[in-house]
């Protein structure tokens, strides 16, 4: 979640913030972008490499079609215009984590242009369209690890496929940035394009920020949600102070230290990357129908799911709908039970099932109480084969013991079978109610004085005495009769 550490932060209405983002997103492919090395995130250093990944002479790149497909899916999800022609270029620079001496990217002819992402009420933001300049496919670099006396380089990450998404400078406050990044994470993870995790490096964010139209400052490699907020707040306040003191803003690249931003290089010292087309990779030529075909293949996007869940027939509040959206397995579970017990699905799922897990401090697991089990329990209660109290006892037992018994077996194990309706049962119910009335004169007085809710106290004691075998309505009818 996003956090705000600069508690004294506030916007100065005389100094307008403008911000744009560059988001680098690792694609969830089996193999790397231009080689058959497996993508690797937690393997020992330098164990998932090919000759091409480390730039050995004579090796050549070959485009991974899975990476191209994921990049195209992202382009469609973000309403971008897929280009019929795109190509790869070499971005030259020298750094230990880039063994080729250049990065393969799409500088001149990117994969997609002119997209947008809508922020709205579901993001707790007034309607705002954030335009996307382009989406390009490119390589990730290796990873450097600094020690006191040396730098170690791990090339497992080198040549991992990325998309770089570049927005227009449309953000007018940091809240919009938060909402955009959160929504972006949700969409790429929902479509299984990327894990969407900032903290693991699967997503990395660069921010360009300016105040009152002055030169922009780029903040590089913001690696967590907290860093994005803190760095933008700090940099906005730094630029405002400079302007208030009559000083200018230098166009430069800065880095986040954890406490502030520091200058890395100025515009005058900016790197000349000497972009040239990559002669070893053919251009990508796509059919004009590719966008329509991809649109048909995409699942429901998050906003569409939320819109569906908060309206008929589900009628969920937005908080419940969002909780389901962020947990795809749980959403599937909910929709499965809703198809069978629609009228009672919300009550049983949120008030009974999730409560049974929460009361025991256990995280909800769709495998512990399968949808078919919950549906069976609900139907047994509806046909009065077991009571509501018995159903709660069964859920409690399953959660605590991870029971795989059938419902019939659980009713037997827990001795919850409802007694046969006969005169003997009616007499037993009457005797229990009479004893409870006798033992609770204060509650009876409250009921006599018009406190109708006090009747639930008596019913609760009766249910406890019978271990949930008898329905609450049977006790309620008997208590009302005896208390007339």
UniProtKB/Swiss-Prot annotation:
> Which Pfam family is one of this chain's hits?
GatB_Yqey
Please state what class of enzyme this protein is.
Answer: ligase
Q: Which InterPro entries match?
A: Asn/Gln-tRNA_amidoTrfase_suB/E, Asn/Gln-tRNA_Trfase_suB/E_cat, Asn/Gln_amidotransferase, Asn/Gln_tRNA_amidoTrase-B-like, GatB, GatB_Yqey_C_2, Gln-tRNA_amidoTrfase_suB_CS, Gln_synth/guanido_kin_cat_dom
Among the GO biological process terms of this entry, one is: glutaminyl-tRNAGln biosynthesis via transamidation
MF terms from GO for this chain are: ATP binding; glutaminyl-tRNA synthase (glutamine-hydrolyzing) activity
| Reactions catalysed according to its record | L-glutamyl-tRNA(Gln) + L-glutamine + ATP + H2O = L-glutaminyl-tRNA(Gln) + L-glutamate + ADP + phosphate + H(+)
Assign the protein's first listed, main location to one coarse class.
mitochondrion
Record carries keyword Ribonucleoprotein:
no
SUPFAM superfamilies, per database record: GatB/YqeY motif (SSF89095), Glutamine synthetase/guanido kinase (SSF55931)
Task: State the EC number(s).
Answer: 6.3.5.-
**Which GO cellular component terms are attached?**
glutamyl-tRNA(Gln) amidotransferase complex; mitochondrion
Q: Which domain of life is it from?
A: Eukaryota
Report the locations given in the UniProt record: Mitochondrion
Keyword tags: ATP-binding, Ligase, Mitochondrion, Nucleotide-binding, Protein biosynthesis
Similarity-based family: Belongs to the GatB/GatE family. GatB subfamily.
The protein's assembly and partners = Subunit of the heterotrimeric GatFAB amidotransferase (AdT) complex, composed of A, B and F subunits.
Q: Could you share any additional remarks the record makes about this protein? A: This protein may be expected to contain an N-terminal transit peptide but none has been predicted.
Task: Report the protein's function.
Answer: Allows the formation of correctly charged Gln-tRNA(Gln) through the transamidation of misacylated Glu-tRNA(Gln) in the mitochondria. The reaction takes place in the presence of glutamine and ATP through an activated gamma-phospho-Glu-tRNA(Gln).
For this entry, the protein name equals Glutamyl-tRNA(Gln) amidotransferase subunit B, mitochondrial
In which organism is this protein found?
A: Candida tropicalis (strain ATCC MYA-3404 / T1) (Yeast)
Q: Which classification does the entry list for the species?
A: Eukaryota, Fungi, Dikarya, Ascomycota, Saccharomycotina
């Amino acid at each position: 979640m996003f956090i705000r550490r600069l508690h004294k932060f506030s916007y100065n209405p005389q100094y307008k913030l403008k911000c744009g983002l560059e988001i680098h997103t690792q694609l969830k492919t089996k193999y790397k972008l231009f080689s058959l090395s497996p993508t690797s995130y937690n393997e020992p250093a330098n164990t998932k490499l090919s000759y091409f990944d480390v730039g050995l002479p004579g090796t050549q790149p070959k485009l991974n079609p899975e990476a191209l497909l994921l990049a195209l899916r992202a382009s469609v999800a973000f309403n971008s215009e897929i280009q019929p022609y795109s190509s790869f270029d070499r971005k030259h620079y020298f750094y230990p984590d880039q063994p080729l001496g250049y990065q393969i990217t799409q500088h001149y002819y990117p994969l997609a242009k002119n997209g947008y992402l809508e922020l709205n009420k579901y993001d707790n933001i007034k309607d705002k369209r954030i335009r996307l300049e382009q989406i390009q496919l490119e390589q990730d670099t290796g990873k450097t690890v600094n020690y006191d006396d040396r730098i170690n380089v791990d090339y497992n990450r080198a040549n991992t496929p990325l998309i770089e998404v570049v927005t227009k400078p449309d953000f007018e406050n940091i809240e919009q940035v938060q909402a955009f990044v959160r929504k972006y994470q949700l969409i790429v993870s929902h479509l299984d394009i990327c894990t969407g995790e900032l903290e693991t490096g699967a997503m990395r964010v660069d921010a360009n920020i300016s105040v009152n139209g002055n030169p922009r400052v780029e903040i590089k490699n913001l690696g967590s949600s907290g860093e994005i907020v803190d760095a933008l707040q700090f940099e906005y306040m730094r630029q405002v102070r400079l302007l208030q003191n009559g000083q200018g803003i230098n166009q430069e690249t800065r880095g986040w230290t954890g406490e502030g931003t520091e200058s890395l290089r100025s515009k005058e010292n900016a790197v000349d990357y000497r972009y040239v087309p990559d002669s070893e990779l053919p251009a990508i030529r796509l059919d004009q129908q590719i966008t329509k075909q991809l649109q048909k293949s995409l699942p429901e996007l998050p906003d569409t799911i939320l819109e569906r869940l908060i309206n008929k027939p589900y009628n969920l509040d937005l908080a419940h709908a969002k909780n389901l959206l962020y947990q795809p397995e749980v959403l599937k579970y909910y929709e499965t039970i809703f198809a069978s017990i629609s009228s009672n699905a919300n009550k049983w799922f949120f008030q009974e099932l999730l409560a049974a897990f929460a009361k025991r401090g256990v995280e909800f697991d769709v495998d512990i109480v399968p949808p078919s089990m919950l549906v069976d329990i609900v139907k047994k209660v509806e046909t009065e084969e077991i009571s509501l109290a018995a159903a709660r006892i069964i859920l409690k037992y399953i959660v605590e013991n991870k029971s795989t018994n059938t419902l019939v077996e659980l009713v037997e194990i827990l001795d919850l079978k409802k007694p046969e309706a006969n005169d003997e049962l009616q007499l037993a119910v009457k005797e229990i109610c009479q004893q409870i009335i006798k033992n609770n004169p204060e509650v009876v007085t409250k009921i006599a004085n018009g406190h109708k809710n006090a009747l639930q106290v008596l019913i609760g004691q009766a249910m406890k005495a019978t271990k949930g075998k008898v329905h609450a309505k049977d006790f309620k009818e008997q208590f009302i009769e005896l208390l007339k």
